[in-house]
Amino acid sequence: MLTSPSLSTLGAMTLSRVYGFKPQSIYKFIEEAGSIENLFRLDDNHRQSLKLGDDALEYSLKEWERMRALGAHFISIEDEAYPKLLRECEDAPIGLYYRSDSEPEEFFSHPMISIVGTRDISPYGRLWCQNIVHALAQTPTKPSIVSGLALGVDGVAHESALRESLPTIAVLPTGIESYSPRSHYQLSEKCAHTPDCALISDFSIGYPVTATNFLRRNRIIAGLSRATILIESKKHGGGLITARLASEYNRDVFVLPGRIDDIRSQGCNNLLEQELAEVIANLETLSSRLGLGRTYLSARGSFCERIENHYGNLPPEMLEDLLKVANCITEHRNDMMEEIAQRCSLTYSRVLSLCMMMQKDGLLQIDLLQRCHIIVKK
């Protein structure tokens, strides 16, 4: 007979695999039995009627062996290390698989902020996602950035956190051994092997990606954190669903404002219209509204200050033109080069030359419409 701790763990793994999409059923069974262990000490015939018989436990034991061979672990909701805010959710997962070089007591100990949004991230969204993470990194209370490891906003959020030396937790829509998307293999490995960071999932080993997985994943992203920040989202985007779930859990929701005619901002603007979210209007006050203390951003400086520091040895006349262009790009983010030239009273060829120089030096990105986007670096 399995020892009590092993029976509790294997029982939670079994419940997660069989009833992962029906958490209410899981908690009904546990409430009736008194605990996970008590549930799996019931008569096998009774448990067979619930699809939780000895054969299901034996399968979980094999899964546990595969899990450990992969360097992964599992904690149940009955474990002290299970994240407190997630435990408060009525549909909380019965357990979590994880891969990390740190213990759950460590990577779940930080205040958590979720950052989510569209896979089709714009240069504007990328810039401000990076800016927001940078601002959070300047707070006295260093939060952990939670997201879903998807393309777009998720990837930028994780990468920015790692660059800023913030912990980050990636919640997967698959088994813990999988990588989705595969292009984020290196990023996922960094999350697994950076101190205080982790990959987590409530899907059993080998569970494939299906469309229904994402809602189940999103409720973990929303439930882990004291607040969710939506960077960009289309009208029916997954990030919008996560933000709505966070609101239903009575957590704070913040959104990056966007143009009313921008398809990537429809979700954010809808939340604002419905008064389900607060607008991010000032990075220096955002962190205090998140309960993280005040942010001090002076060390980073403005884009113009970065230009002045980078090109300080240029002839004064050339530096003056550069600063004109940099200031115009900062204040008029969607202007094309012809419009920048008009605003700065410079020739188009002069602006093109200066912008190409800044792009070559990694300070700007010029798109196909000749709009200039500031590249944020630490």
Give each language-model segment a name:
Residues M1-A81, D361-R371, V376-K378:
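Short, small/acidic-rich helices and loops at N termini and domain boundaries
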Residues L2-P5, S76-K378:
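Glycine-biased, small-residue-rich flexible motifs in mid-sequence functional cores and linkers
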